Amino acid sequence: MNIELGLNKKVRRAYGIDEIALVPGNRTLDYDLTDPSWMIGNLKREVPIVASAMDSVVDVNTAAELTKLGALGVINMEGIQTRYENPDEILNQIASVGKNDFVPLMQKIYSEPVKGELILKRINEVKERGGIAAFSGTPQAAIKFQEILNNSKLDLFFLQGTVVSTEHIGMEGKESLNIKDLCKSMRVPVVAGNCVTYEVAKLLMRAGVA
């Protein structure tokens, strides 16, 4: 079902897993007649799967492989991939420790700052492997690294947050984020979610979110 947002912009109703119930009916449908494809901006994906932007889920190789399979993998721009030159060594450390040592190790690992040159390197690595470069970052990171992202081969930017609204107000002295301004200034489509109500989702899309 298409929904008109105004300014010639249309969106399609999406459903969560909990909203779907498969009930056998009196007719069946040949799978060749179905079309599960979807689009973000000018990017078309054949499989409606987006892999989570978590260090334990998506790295450069995973993102490239998911692209080849018709899906999409998102890399955490503020994770291990952009803090360390060799993220595999860090992942091996995490896998090797017990429960008692896990928290101190994670605190130590994530105390290392995110490096702009590594963001650029990971984007290039995904593209060199034929993948779609989709990266996720917080509002603060979106502001801090926007110039690097706009001058890279990035394809999609996912705005990361527990709750996302059209305007993020930061602490005094810190630059605040306005999603409408971000969407206008970013070279690539901006994706955002984690909103509960229909009204907020509509506001986000009207602000320019893909």
Question: Which stretches of residues belong to each language-model region?
Answer:
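Active-site entrance/lid segments in N-terminal catalytic domains of soluble metabolic enzymes
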Residues: 1-210
